[in-house]
Each structure stands twice: as structure tokens, then as C-alpha cells.
């Protein structure tokens, strides 16, 4: 059985050597990002996420990494995000929220720090926020209907959706020039204070996501309905945010 690392750094040397062997001089950098680079990493539960930057010639040789990617997935390493330097820099206006969150917690494992000089236009972030919030609200509603009221499925829907909303909260705080806290609960609390939403609802959702709540079936349903209501309130606010 593949060994799941207790800490991501346990695999840095092995992984770096493997991808250097595969791509050689076409490997520009390997960067760890996400929970593995912060305080939220849980061995066996959290994926380990890497951004691997390649030259144009290297990106055309991804077939060489097929076996390596499959092997690392057995050790909870997510499929790496492979990009060229040009594509990464060109994504600052298309995917600013993803890159903003990536830049919050990362570790350069090998090569150049390709994230250091990335900067984000607040107009681009606001536009993506509006699109993401409204789109995710629609998915929440349709997802709720698909549960047919099954509390286990409602719990799963909360757990699957909350992390994405916390990432959006980070972008919302960035728009208001508010320092983004490190922990999920702290981010939720800060967003609630900054935007007048009920942080307590999202904190209950976080308890459900972590599996530490003691809510009844009716309470879980009530939490979810309040969850959708607060997201709807955020959608109404985003149009009024000046950048």
C-alpha cells in the first residue's frame, strides 16, 4: 500500500528528483500550495497540491508524466497543475481568485518562485466574484433539490461546497483591503464582520464539513437553507462593491 505522507515535505526530494528526471531542463519550478502549505493539512484526508511550471517544450511532453502522476495519486497527491510561465502570467486576469488563494499559502519546492511577482486587478477579482457567487448559488439550489431531503446528502453538499466559498471570502476581504486571516474559522468571522453576513451559519457549516457537529436532521436542513440565504445576500452586495 502506498504510504501517505504525514507532512508534505516528506516527499519533496523524491518528487523533485522524479520530475527533474522526466522533464530535465524544461522543468522551471515545483510549488506546493493549498492546505499542505498552510495549517489545515490533515494526513490521509487533505490532498497535496502542486503547481509545476514547464517550458513550452516541456508542456508538450506531458505524456511522459502519466505514470508518475498515477503513482503519486495513490499517496494523496492531487493531479498537479501543469502550466507554462506564459500561461501562468496570462491567467492573472482570467483566474485571479484561484491565483490569489494559491499565493496566500505556498512553498517553493524546487526552482523559481513563479508566484512572487503575480499581481491582481481588483476589477478582475470583482467580476470573477460575481460570476462565481451567482454560479455556485445556482448549484447549491439544484444540489439541494437533488438530495430529495436526504440529510446525509445535504451534509455532503455542505462539505463539498464550503471550501470554495471560503476561497471567495478571501477574495472579498482582498477587495476591501482587509488582511486575510490564516484559519478557515477566522476567515469566516472576518467576512461576516466586513459584509454583514451571518458568520454563525458558515461556522456551523464548517462543523458539518469537519464532521464534529451534533445537529439533528431538521437542524442540518435549517442550516443549509440559511446557508443559501446568506450566499444570496452576498450576491446582492457584490454589485455595490466599488473597486
Task: Briefly describe each language-model feature range.
Residues 1-2, 115:
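Short glycine/proline- and acidic residue-enriched helix-loop micro-motifs
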Residues 2-22, 38-45, 51-95:
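Metal-dependent nucleotidyltransferase catalytic core
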Residues 17-21, 71, 108, 193, ...:
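A generic structural signal for well-ordered alpha-helical segments enriched in polar/charged residues
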Residues 23, 27:
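Active-site palm subdomain of RNA-directed nucleic acid polymerases
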Residues 28-36:
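Short gly/ser-rich loop at a beta-strand->alpha-helix junction or flexible surface loop bordering the NTP-binding
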Residues 62, 66-156:
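Conserved NTP/Mg2+-binding pocket subregion across the NTase superfamily
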Amino acid at each position: 500500500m502506498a504510504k501517505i505522507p504525514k507532512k508534505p515535505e516528506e516527499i519533496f526530494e523524491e518528487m523533485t528528483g522524479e520530475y527533474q528526471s522526466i522533464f530535465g531542463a524544461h522543468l522551471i519550478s515545483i510549488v506546493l500550495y493549498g492546505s499542505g502549505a498552510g495549517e489545515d493539512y490533515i494526513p490521509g484526508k487533505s490532498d497535496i497540491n502542486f503547481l509545476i511550471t514547464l517550458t513550452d517544450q516541456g508542456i508538450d511532453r506531458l505524456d511522459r508524466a502519466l505514470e508518475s502522476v498515477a503513482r503519486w495519486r495513490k499517496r494523496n497527491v492531487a493531479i498537479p497543475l501543469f502550466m507554462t510561465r506564459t500561461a501562468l502570467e496570462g491567467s492573472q486576469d482570467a483566474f485571479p481568485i484561484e491565483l490569489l488563494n494559491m499565493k496566500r499559502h505556498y512553498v517553493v519546492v524546487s526552482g523559481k518562485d513563479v508566484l512572487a511577482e503575480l499581481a491582481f486587478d481588483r476589477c478582475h477579482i470583482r467580476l470573477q466574484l460575481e460570476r462565481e457567487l451567482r454560479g455556485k448559488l445556482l448549484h447549491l439550489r439544484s444540489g439541494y433539490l437533488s438530495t430529495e431531503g436526504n440529510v446525509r446528502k445535504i451534509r455532503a453538499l455542505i462539505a463539498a461546497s464550503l471550501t470554495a466559498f471560503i476561497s471567495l471570502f478571501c477574495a472579498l476581504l482582498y477587495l476591501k483591503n482587509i488582511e486575510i486571516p490564516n484559519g478557515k474559522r477566522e476567515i469566516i468571522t472576518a467576512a461576516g464582520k466586513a459584509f454583514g453576513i451571518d458568520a454563525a451559519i458558515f461556522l456551523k457549516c464548517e462543523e458539518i464539513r469537519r464532521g464534529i457537529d451534533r445537529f439533528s436532521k431538521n437542524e442540518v436542513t435549517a442550516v443549509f437553507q440559511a446557508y443559501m440565504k446568506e450566499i444570496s445576500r452576498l450576491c446582492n452586495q457584490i454589485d455595490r462593491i466599488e473597486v
